From Swiss-Prot:
Signal peptide: none annotated. Part of the 30S ribosomal subunit. InterPro entries: NA-bd_OB-fold, Ribosomal_uS12, Ribosomal_uS12_bac. Keywords: Chloroplast, Plastid, Ribonucleoprotein, Ribosomal protein, RNA-binding, rRNA-binding. HAMAP family: Ribosomal_uS12_B. This is Small ribosomal subunit protein uS12cz/uS12cy. With S4 and S5 plays an important role in translational accuracy. Located at the interface of the 30S and 50S subunits. PROSITE patterns: RIBOSOMAL_S12. The gene is rps12-A. One of its GO terms (cellular component) is chloroplast. GO terms for molecular function: rRNA binding; structural constituent of ribosome. GO terms for biological process: translation. The keyword Plastid applies.
Amino acid sequence: MPTVKQLIRNARQPIRNARKTAALKGCPQRRGTCARVYTINPKKPNSALRKVARVRLTSGFEITAYIPGIGHNLQEHSVVLVRGGRVKDLPGVRYRIIRGTLDAVAVKNRQQGRSKYGVKKPKK
């Protein structure tokens, strides 16, 4: 326990909270290039083949990003836009690829929740 004199000389430093999306460097989104596109298995009790991509960002980081939606056209060297947002059952996946921008096409035949998958409003 420090004395009052020690606290006057050297004030306590506030604890800084670590950023959950450090690779974005404070930006809402970042552009990146896919280095590898593959599937991984989720944690127990879930079972699936989740589509993810290893992305090299313009900030210099290489991250693992989730590819949301059914079906995708991404491959190595595809240019994608990445946002923050973890996938609860995939350890280490803290980013998501934004569909409908750059090389990531929108999800086909999507009727509800379209904005999250880059789908335009259907014509009547």
